[in-house]
Amino acid sequence: MACYIVPYYHHPVLSHPNREIFSHRHHHHHRFCNNLLNRRISVPRSSAISDGGVSYNTLVSEAVRLLVPQANFDSSKLKVEFLGELLENKSNGGIITPRTYILSHCDFTANLTLTISNVINLDQLEGWYKKDDVVAEWKKVNDELRLHIHCCVSGMSLLQDVAAELRYHIFSKELPLVLKAVVHGDSVMFRENPELMDAYVWVYFHSSTPKYNRIECWGPLKDAAKGKQQGNHQGFLSSTTSRKLIRHKSIFHTLFTFLL
């Protein structure tokens, strides 16, 4: 598993946003909104990463392995909802970008809900960090499609900060189930575009703790969904490097910055 650690960044334009720009009902806001969403953050290249490593509490990792049961994907417990343009044409698997996913779960029933859309609204994103939802989006980088996964490890509450390492390991353990839910729930698109199973999965762990505020490459989707991970490569990004990376932002990064 290739691993890259990045700090949070703040864009001056997005520091004090007007939340109304996400309402497509107002034409004069629509153009400004599109300009923001077209800004994308580049994935760091290995040449931009200095050598380094991350040390973890092996007791926490082992506790998660032993005490947190491995969740097996059960398609009968998955509910799929299509929103936006995809609501009118669910069978159209050709719309790959923009295409986003939000996977939510119920702790009591173990039921899953996968929302598939071409946009992410603020109400959905608030649920991302309040209910431990997982957000994903397809993104084209250098003519290659990649699936970007976003998990909120800590930063939204004191309890999350205290349990940052525990939450990181739990998210890591549950990610194969998340990927299986995406593949099953959006089966029409994957059936029409089988090459997407070879697309690389990039996982963004968002945290106020620098150690867990990181990006990890989990390899091809077909392997990541099975929990198979490749060789480990780690490194730290310097603050200078991170500033250079603030060139383009994904839909998710733009919306997330609006909540900060």
Curated annotation (Swiss-Prot):
GO terms for biological process: chlorophyll catabolic process; chloroplast organization. This is Magnesium dechelatase SGRL, chloroplastic. It catalyses: chlorophyllide a + 2 H(+) = pheophorbide a + Mg(2+). One of its GO terms (molecular function) is lyase activity. Its EC number is 4.99.1.10. Keywords: Chlorophyll catabolism, Chloroplast, Lyase, Plastid, Stress response, Thylakoid, Transit peptide. The gene is SGRL. It is an enzyme of class 4 (lyase). Its main location: plastid. GO terms for cellular component: chloroplast thylakoid.
